[in-house]
Curated annotation (Swiss-Prot):
Residues 7-189 form the tr-type G domain. GTP binds at D19, H20, G21, K22, S23, T24, N136, K137, I138, D139. It comes from Clostridium tetani (strain Massachusetts / E88). This is Elongation factor 4. Its main location: membrane. Belongs to the TRAFAC class translation factor GTPase superfamily. Classic translation factor GTPase family. LepA subfamily. Keywords: Cell membrane, GTP-binding, Hydrolase, Membrane, Nucleotide-binding, Protein biosynthesis. Required for accurate and efficient protein synthesis under certain stress conditions. May act as a fidelity factor of the translation reaction, by catalyzing a one-codon backward translocation of tRNAs on improperly translocated ribosomes. Back-translocation proceeds from a post-translocation (POST) complex to a pre-translocation (PRE) complex, thus giving elongation factor G a second chance to translocate the tRNAs correctly. Binds to ribosomes in a GTP-dependent manner. It is found in: Cell membrane. GO terms for molecular function: GTP binding; GTPase activity; ribosome binding; translation elongation factor activity. It catalyses: GTP + H2O = GDP + phosphate + H(+). SMART domains: EFG_C.
């Protein structure tokens, strides 16, 4: 039996490509419904992290409860769940969408549909959400709302004839959006008498309350004092507080089927309350969990080391604190001959890695060195044993390897048709396999490629943007593994292997990559008192060499005229000294060297 109250609840999220105005629209909705006054408003209210505001991106999911009074005096409860728009956080998006019945699709009237818009839109359609298209930025002179409406109808196949035309910046027609949500988004179905089922769509650590779980109650009710069980981990807790977000926390007595809110239950670690897990009652558990849960799988690995070795403990503490709030971050200790003690960290993708590094440097004031990112390679040894390699230094000897496999991703790139040539060339250079291309309209194309993940994690995105003057957009997802001919490229300085610079590269690229790195390091490594050979090697075979010349003191300065044999003696003596120095000398490697390894010249 659906209660009257339930019929007046709407759960929705906002999906959009980066920079199409998602967080600004959320701000306007909060303002229009009087949830926050103008005075409390602040740009991007739901993006609470400094980093989110600075980069203008949303990283964590957030939620807010809006009370909307229609003209017929009925009050509606609208639960807005803000989702991240970036491809690294795809799983977070899918969990937030699973907590909703509808989604507002924001499309920029000047840019039209982009890759991420499509990807998130298909995610929403998979969850059977009602999609409400909204066209934003119509106050700009270059807006073309009618064309964009046609695009939405042609590509996604949803009716956009009565899509509200709004400007989130100036607050134009915001009321139409609220009306559309009430009209089009279905109310939540779910019985209050059934056993409890609630979906965790985000969790966050609070120093006083422990872990705060953001939940959407699908069936049943939950109140303080209920003993709950988490279905993925099997752990049991007692609920200490339930409430809703007005974006701040507001305590209420309980949550019923269809509600979105938070619960706390003295949970100590975010890992115990994983995003996507199902909460049920310990006494009367649900028979099966809500579908779609999967643990977050790191795709990209990188070593993080403190610049000052003594700060190892502080770095560990920083990572543990970040992990409390970010279940997708994984790390384990490792040592490197060149860099000392540090951690091998796993991330969802490059943006995630970048954000974690920046947060370590910012929030914990630590100077860190990061090594080149790498992916998980599956190595099958000659004795049929299979191992996963995330760090090139752990790769077995060449003679022990039967074959290696690397992860492949499916990429869809949306670009203006003028840039198809350069972009196809870029994908070809990155060992991409062309699948197909479709014209969205006469001027825009979707290109589908399968590309090895390790070709994307360096600087594919930058290269894509520069080839298309910033117009192309990219979306990718992991497809599986494929067998490839790969070798380990080592860098030797002064005859010593620098383990932190090792990398796994495709065999046919080893020579050019080695050549590039040797030349790059020659520019970066400062000249020493002795000459330093830089060698790139595969196995025991050196494939490229550069030499950093020695600095020399003018030992003949005080000889004037003088006898040639005297000069010879001094020069020989200098040569001897340099030789001895080279045997005992060690070379300082500047931080840029580790970073420059990543930038491959196209």
């Amino acid at each position: 039996m659906t209660s009257e109250r339930q019929k007046r609840v709407r759960n929705f999220s906002i999906i959009a490509h980066i920079d199409h105005g998602k967080s600004t629209l959320a701000d306007r909705l909060l303002e229009e419904t009087g949830t926050l006054t103008q005075r409390e408003m602040d740009e991007q209210t739901l993006d609470t992290m400094d980093l989110e505001k600075e980069r203008g991106i949303t990283i964590k999911s957030q939620a807010a409860r809006l009370i909307y009074k229609r003209d017929d005096e009925k009050e509606y409860i609208l639960n807005l769940i803000d989702t991240p728009g970036h491809v690294d956080f795809n799983y977070e998006v899918s969990r937030s969408l699973a907590a909703c019945e509808g989604a507002i699709l924001v499309v920029d009237a000047t840019q039209g549909i982009q890759a991420q818009t499509l990807a998130n839109c298909y995610l929403a359609l998979e969850h059977n959400l009602e999609i409400v298209p909204v066209i934003n930025k119509i106050d700009l002179p270059s807006a073309r709302p009618e064309e964009v409406k046609r695009e939405i109808e042609d590509i996604i196949g949803i009716d956009a004839s009565d899509a509200p035309l709004i400007s989130a910046k100036t607050g134009l027609n915001i009321k139409d959006v609220l009306e559309a949500v009430v009209e089009k988004v279905p109310y939540p179905k779910g019985e209050e008498e059934e056993p409890l089922k609630a979906l965790i769509f985000d969790s966050y650590y609070d120093a006083y309350k422990g872990v705060v779980c953001y939940v959407r109650v699908k069936e049943g009710t939950i109140k303080p004092g209920t003993e709950i069980k988490l279905m993925a981990t099997g752990r049991k807790y007692e609920v200490t507080e339930t409430g809703v977000f007005v974006p701040e926390y507001m305590k209420i007595d309980g949550l019923e089927a269809g509600d979105v809110g938070y619960i706390t239950a003295s949970i100590k670690n975010v890992r115990d309350a994983r995003v996507g897990d199902t909460i049920t009652e310990a006494k009367r558990p649900a028979t099966e969990a809500l579908e779609g849960y999967r643990p977050a799988i790191p795709m990209v690995f990188s070593g993080i080391y403190p610049v000052d070795g003594a700060k190892y403990g502080e770095l560990k503490e920083a990572l543990e604190k970040l992990q409390i709030n970010d279940a997708a971050l994984s790390f384990e200790p490792e040592t490197s001959i060149a860099l000392g003690f540090g951690f091998r960290c796993g991330f969802l993708g490059l943006l995630h890695m970048d954000i974690i590094q920046e947060r370590i440097e910012r929030e914990f004031n630590l100077d860190i060195i990061t090594t080149a990112p790498s992916v998980i390679y599956k190595v099958t040894k000659t004795n049929k044993e299979t191992i996963d390699v995330t760090n090139p230094t752990n790769l077995p000897e060449e003679s022990e390897i039967a074959y290696m496999e690397e992860p492949i991703v499916e990429c869809s790139i949306i670009t203006p048709s003028d840039y198809v040539g350069p972009i196809m060339e870029l994908c070809q250079n990155r060992r991409g396999v062309f699948k197909d291309m479709q014209y969205i309209e006469t001027t825009r194309v979707v290109l589908n490629y399968d590309i090895p993940l390790n070709e994307i994690i360096y600087d594919f995105f930058d290269a894509l943007k520069s080839r298309s003057r910033g117009y192309a957009s990219l979306d990718y997802e992991l497809k599986g593994y494929t067998q490839s001919k790969l070798v380990k490229l080592d860098i030797l300085l002064n005859g010593d292997n620098v383990d932190a610079l090792s990398m796994i590269v495709p065999e046919e690229r080893a020579y050019s990559r080695g050549r590039q790195m040797a030349e790059k390091l020659k520019e970066i490594i400062p000249r020493q008192m002795f000459e330093v050979p830089i060698q790139a090697a595969v196995g025991s075979k050196v494939i490229a060499r550069e030499t950093v010349r020695a600095l020399r003191k003018d030992v003949l300065a005080k000889c004037y005229g003088g006898d040639i044999s005297r000069k010879k003696k001094l020069l020989e003596k200098q040569k001897e000294g340099k030789k001895r120095m080279r045997q005992i000398g060690s070379v300082e490697i500047p931080q840029e060297a580790f970073m420059s390894v990543l930038k491959t010249e196209e």
